[in-house]
A protein has these predicted regions:
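C-terminal non-catalytic interaction/assembly regions of soluble proteins
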Residues: 1-55, 297-299, 303-409
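Glycine-rich oxoanion-binding loops at beta->alpha junctions
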Residues: 31-54, 100-156, 161-162, 184, ...
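N-terminal phosphate-binding or glycine-rich loops at protein starts, especially the Walker A/P-loop
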Residues: 51-101
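Short glycine-rich or small-residue beta-strand-to-loop segments that form or flank ligand, phosphate
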Residues: 59-71, 122-127, 152-157, 220-224, ...
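A glycine- and small-aliphatic-rich helix-loop capping segment at beta-alpha/alpha-beta transitions
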Residues: 77-86, 107-112, 168-178, 194-198, ...
Length: 409
């Protein structure tokens, strides 16, 4: 017997080439029921805020917010190209939400977007604008948007903080907004973010160069990359480079990792001819050697520790090869990485679908983020449901299994 608050599950069986089935009720536990009801309520509110009707949008406004990233130019150009094909006027806002509050909104022509697809970073500028959390600043932005609100949509390209800003003006003021994920940190669940592949490609060039000099000189390199408190970028860089180890914020005990994996690996391999020693570190990963974490204090500690070790394997004679320990911080170089073909392709897919759905099915995309999956599959995730991406512990473990088996070359 079906009761309110239960799911209805249909079970199918195949007998003599025919499908048969029956329905059964499965009760929800209280926490699941509450979560589902909350989701339904919030989604109903989102759909009620959608004022655009199919075929009624006339103007499109786009901005890039937060930390810059590769691929943004390709997305912006596709928004202009596809928008014009659908008969829309397209406007860009310079320097993100800061520009919106200052009314730095410009109409865009074909000439303005020439060469934009290959532009590193954001060709229309970006900014971190913490003041946008203030209600008065949001009202200033709304005054800038006032002439466009009736028949326009705002597209926000950026990371989790920028998407929170987009959600705020959608829920508070009813702005018809769509988010496109863009961050080298790739820390948004359910999508690949613009800039991630470009950052990895540039990091790979640097790390491969460091591997070559490490193997030649017997040096040890700790390479720090950005991550905004997450290790997705560091893990991808370390895995593709076959680094000896990786320090990330998600690890429950970085100090033990330093002792067991970093120093343990060096004890086994330091002095092996033509062996590189590369460790990738996510910025601000906490450890006991420096209050700022990351590579700070770590390099000195490792250098001081290995200085106490006896002559290492692979060395003969009265003189040993010195193993210099170095820190290399890639930092903001990865934000300005030239966009890779993959990032440009993802950007164009996301931008095209954004415009198409705004024109044809606005109720499915307003108040949402467009998400990219493999095989060019585009989905939408409501802005209220955007969440942090879980760390890939399976890849982390696979990387270290190979290390323990001494498979690295």
């Amino acid at each position: 017997e079906y009761k309110e608050g239960q799911d209805n599950v249909v079970l199918l069986t195949l007998e003599n080439g025919k499908l048969s089935g029956y329905s059964t009720a499965v009760g929800l536990i209280e926490s699941d029921r509450v979560a589902r009801e909350a989701w339904v309520t919030v989604e109903r509110e989102r759909s009620q805020r959608v004022t655009l009707k199919p075929g009624r949008i006339k103007r499109l406004i786009a901005l890039v917010s937060g930390g810059d990233f590769g691929g943004g130019g390709a997305a912006l150009k596709e928004l202009r190209v596809t928008g014009n094909r659908f008969g829309l006027e397209v406007f860009f806002v310079r320097h993100g939400f800061l520009g919106l509050a200052n009314n730095w909104i410009d109409a865009v022509t074909e000439e303005d977007t020439r060469g934009m697809s290959s532009h590193a970073s954001s060709p229309i500028g970006s900014s971190r604008f913490e003041d946008f959390k203030d209600e008065q600043v949001q009202r200033a932005a709304m005054r800038s948007l006032a002439p466009y609100l009736e028949d326009s949509a705002l597209v926000v390209l950026g990371g989790d903080g920028s998407l929170r800003g987009a959600r705020a003006i959608h829920e508070t003021y009813g702005v018809q907004v769509v988010g496109i994920p863009g961050t080298i940190d790739n820390n948004i669940a359910g999508t690949t973010s613009l800039g991630f592949h470009s950052a990895i490609a540039l990091a790979n060039q640097s790390i491969e160069s460091l591997k070559a000099t490490s193997a030649a000189m017997g040096s040890i390199f700790f390479v720090e990359v950005m991550g905004a408190g997450s290790g997705h970028l560091a893990l991808a860089c370390a895995y593709q480079a076959r680094a000896e180890g990786i320090l990330v914020n998600e690890h429950p005990d970085p100090d033990t990792y330093i002792e067991d994996i970093v120093l343990g690996t060096l004890q086994r391999t330091l002095g092996v001819p033509n062996k590189s020693h590369i460790f990738v570190v996510a910025e601000r990963t906490p450890h006991r050697h420096h209050r700022e974490g990351g590579v700070h204090g770590l390099v000195d500690y490792v250098a001081q520790t290995i200085a106490t070790w006896p002559q290492r394997r692979g060395t003969t004679g009265p003189y040993s090869l010195a193993s210099a320990t170095k820190a290399t911080i890639l930092g903001h170089t990865l934000r300005g990485a030239p966009p890779t073909p993959e990032d440009k392709m993802i950007a164009q897919h996301l931008a095209y679908e954004t415009v198409r759905r705004l024109v044809e099915q606005p109720d499915t995309i307003v108040g949402c983020m467009v998400a990219y999956h493999d095989s060019n599959r585009i989905e939408t995730i409501p802005l209220h449901a955007v969440s942090p991406k879980p760390f890939d512990w399976e890849l982390f473990t696979r990387m270290h299994v190979a290390e323990l088996q001494h498979d690295r070359v």
